Amino acid sequence: MTPIPYAEIGVTTNFSFLHGGSHPQAYVHQAAEYGLTAIGIADHNTLAGIVRAYSELSNDQLGYRPKLLYGARLVFTCGTPDILVYPRDRAAYGRLCQLLTRGKRGSDLDKVAKGDCRLAFEDLFDFIAGQLLVLMPPHRFDEDALGAILARLKDSPAEGVWLAGSLLYRGDDRRRLARLARLAASAKVPLIATNDVLYHHPQQRMLQDVLTCIREKASIESIGRRLQANAERHLKPGHEMARLFRDHPEAIAETLRFTDRIVFSLDQLKYQYPDEPVPPGKTAQGHLEDLTWAGAKTYFGDKLDDRLRAVLNKELALIAELNYAHYFLTVHDIVRYARSEGILCQGRGSAANSAVCYVLGITSVDPTKIDLLFERFISKERLEPPDIDVDFEHSRREEVMQYVYHRYGRHRAAIIATVIHYRPRSAIRDVGKALGLTEDVTSVLADTVWGSWGDGLSDMQVRQAGLDPHNPMIRRAVELASELITFPRHLSQHVGGYVLTQDRLDSYVPIGNAAMDDRTFIEWDKDDVDALSMMKVDVLALGMLTCIRKSFDLIADHKGRRYVLSDIKSEDDNEVYQMLQRGESLGVFQVESRAQMNMLPRLKPRTFYDLVIEVAIVRPGPIQGDMVHPYLRRRNKLEKVTYPSPSPDHGPSDELYKVLHKTLGVPLFQEQAMRIAIEAAKFSPEEANGLRRAMATFRNVGTIGSYEEKMVSNMIARGYDPAFAKSCFDQIKGFGSYGFPESHAASFAQLVYVSSWLKYFHPDAFCCALLNSQPMGFYAPAQIVGDARKNGVEIRDIDVSHSFADNTLEKTDGEYCAVRLGFRQIDGFRWIDRDEERIRKLSEAVRKEALSVSTRSLPAISPVSFRGARSANPESRDSGFALRAPRNDNDRQIPLHNDDREDDWADRIIRARQRRPFTSLEDFARDTALPKRALLLLADADAFRSLGLDRRAALWAVRRLPDDVPLPLFEAAIAREQPDEGAQPLPEMPLPEHVVADYQTIRLSLKGHPMEFLRRRFAAEGVLACRDVNDTNDRRRIRCAGVVLVRQRPGSAKGVVFMTLEDETGIANIVVWPKVMETFRKEVMGARLVLVEGRIQSSPEKVVHLVAERLVDRTADLTLLSDDRLDAIPHGATPAEPLNDDRRDHTDNPSQRVSHPRNVRILPRSRDFH
């Protein structure tokens, strides 16, 4: 049947968050199937979904491509009925973006919250020129009120005004349409047909109902008439709409006239990168070339040979041809600013393939040491903008981000969005609430989900939760939750990707406020930006750079040597590689995970390139392609190095030699996978580019699978071994989950070596800096401290007479300084982080500067002083920036604001002891004027030892103090009134209680490990210590117990869970196979202390695992860690345990009692990764 021409202009997608029940892509396919002339995407106050629909039009599976209209459904705060707005042309589209930006930004005096859009009807008229407006009448409407709105719109410069007619399917549709037709005629506007679509197919109706319940915070049972009355609000074919509007055929025909009026398409967004200021008489390209050759001279001097010169010339020529000089100057400027402020930074990703980026100081991969593939970074065949990722110190990255805003103005710079999708946990929770399941049921179902990703809940997981998977309500909840997964929940800001434009960015895309102060972000994510060929600059954060900078500062302040990143050469120290070969990498960047620690003794890195391979090899790509074991066998001379080749009549036998020779004939990197597709499967440049983009789409593995048949069949047809062809593509699919290109691995390997060098030569500074950079990495403070002590570093307790806010170094007579724990280690203790304070002061200056400027016009914000951005010395720490970081911990004694002293308890202590030493707790309390809560926290952390008080004595002494520090006039009177309880000696606190109290207050203990006090109990059960596990013969069955440090369930491990247990002797590595995991899911996921029974698995390199067969949750044993419960020794009349400040006595109410006498958590939770 020939389709009846019809255009649906009223489509709501799931980017009208919790309003629409289908993806934009689904609408495009459904419209193509129905043969619709056009569809109009009009989400609620947003353009967030339009690029998804636009990109889907290029899908090869579409036989017919309907015209796509890009608009928004304006939902007003003043009660005006919704209006669909479609821009006629590019200029009108820009005005629509600016209108939505107004609603999302507000003003400095009336800031709009993230995710909100506040628009009044009057706002529309400032941007109405060139817009096609469709008034959407509510279910019940007043004809006079609608007539007045239509008249007002008709008198405006709008391109056209229409009244929408839609059916409610409630029995009075013909009468209602007749009223609307009369109203349209009297207002002299056309009536236009729409089904006011909420989902693409009727089968989505149930999910739509659930979304409505979630939005309205109601259950299916209670929501009543707020649900749609039927399943008719789906996309309908033209003949069906013509039948429904048979009394008003002109309304159908009007949809085509409406569509013809619109000439705008996203193809018309001609992106222009902002110009960069250059010296007088210079072009951007000329200035870039001057900087490049100056940098080459700085880095290489007389060693700048002809080969490297040719590489630089080739890159500069391509940059000139593609007109990318401004982009490189932007990134160079940002990096130079950061370095002028003493902020460590380093580029990574495909940009590390560029020699120009290296000599500009953007990346750290020396082009003379690594064979670079510049074409992976920039290629004229791809015609895609370059993408330079730069990592900055995590604690100071915000300074760089604010510099970008002020450098370009908020009207030309904004962060891209990240779409936050429903994942299994959130989906089952929200669906369960909507269906009326109890909180207990939804929680137990959600708790069976490991990590954030997955397709839904299996029957096994439902049974694990103690529920019946065949129960109709449970089954429906699980099915709907599976459908909801991948639906967008809301927009958030990207971790650091900026879009910059020459003209107004808000003429391309709406800009809204982020949750963080002084951040704004656009509505499109990185995939949307890439689809429109817009350049972005990634200003990313890396915790290890913060740790390295703090290590350098500590070394300079305490050892007299100032290091910068370039001082540490990766070929200098064999001892560092020997340390890594032993798997001693706790705290080291990228190689501290369980899998990496196990790989290090097998790989035995000896050179920098070995570190590049180490970083890349423990990734889903090589693992899923089964490339790891062949590489290790060849590296260890257990297997001959061969290179796959085609049959003689299809090509030379060495066609893959250049691709694979550095990795012994085994593909490990993304670049190699792409080259194999070109060389062995003979992909065209377009196909190879599509494959590259698919590999770069993190976790979007579905896009890679479409290339599988062609690549594998092509390779087999050319004579390649089928197993090799299949494994190559399995590797590529792994890259779709997560994989590293060689250039990226090389950038990270630089930091692997630097952090390893610090760990080996300066373990004191490295430990201190790691603690001061938390939270980061795999391991908690207790393990960081334990590792440092094992390596000869003395760790000293927190003490009010010696500690600062941060952990610090103190001189000793030994080889290393001692690490003095700081007040920041005490949970709940108030102290001010100077990096954060610097950013706060900067933000206040920015807001003050812009306060008088209305953001409704969004002009460029006047730059706040960022002196130092043009510093000639990139390593200089002494800039003119008023908010420079403190050089050492003594600087922390001076707060940036006097009124901050009230909130900075650490600062009060330091200032008081500068005036005179503390002699007693009462003296300390008077001099510091700390609140009683602060004194209790210090006492609970055992921080009064220098005053002769242990934890228990200090707690009792604090409890004797008045609640408020008295004025001196009343001190004597109060002292006379205080009973002299100190005269009665308190019994010593048992050591097990001290250890537990340490873990509860500072997350570590220097006095012992909880397991050593349980050792006798476990030894009686035949349980081995962790140290003995590592010395046990292969395949022997044993039992082991320990505190759970880390749980990992990598996506590449096919459901295998890895656990790391710790006791007083060391750690043990546990492997839990999927079947065991399903049987003991509760123990694996929830236990703090676990007993494992299983068999030893030992490799020739003595990498030992315990393969679990049975697990027992022994967390309850931790409650025994008070001496009376372990050994039943009486303590007399005084309390046996210290008193916590939230402790309440409820001796008469058993329901208030808890399992442990301290009424707080026994041990911190493990760190779980997936």
Curated annotation (Swiss-Prot):
Family, as annotated: Belongs to the DNA polymerase type-C family. DnaE2 subfamily.
N-terminal signal peptide: none
Keyword Oxidoreductase: no
Region (Disordered): 867-899, 1129-1170
Subcellular localization(s) per the UniProt record: Cytoplasm
InterPro entries: DNA_pol3_alpha_NTPase_dom, DNA_pol3_finger, DnaE2, DnaE2/DnaE/PolC, DNAPol_HHH, NA-bd_OB-fold, NA-bd_OB_tRNA, PHP_dom
Gene Ontology biological-process entries: DNA repair; DNA replication
Keyword terms, alphabetized: Cytoplasm, DNA damage, DNA repair, DNA replication, DNA-directed DNA polymerase, Nucleotidyltransferase, Transferase
Protein name: Error-prone DNA polymerase
GO terms assigned for molecular function: 3'-5' exonuclease activity; DNA-directed DNA polymerase activity; nucleic acid binding
UniProt catalytic activity: DNA(n) + a 2'-deoxyribonucleoside 5'-triphosphate = DNA(n+1) + diphosphate
Entry-linked NCBIfam families: polc, PRK05672.1
Gene Ontology cellular-component terms listed: cytoplasm
The keyword Phosphoprotein belongs to this UniProt entry's keyword annotation: no
Principal location: cytoplasm
Biological role stated in the UniProt entry: DNA polymerase involved in damage-induced mutagenesis and translesion synthesis (TLS). It is not the major replicative DNA polymerase.
Gene encoding the protein: dnaE2
EC code: 2.7.7.7
Matching Pfam families: DNA_pol3_alpha, DNA_pol3_finger, HHH_6, PHP, tRNA_anti-codon
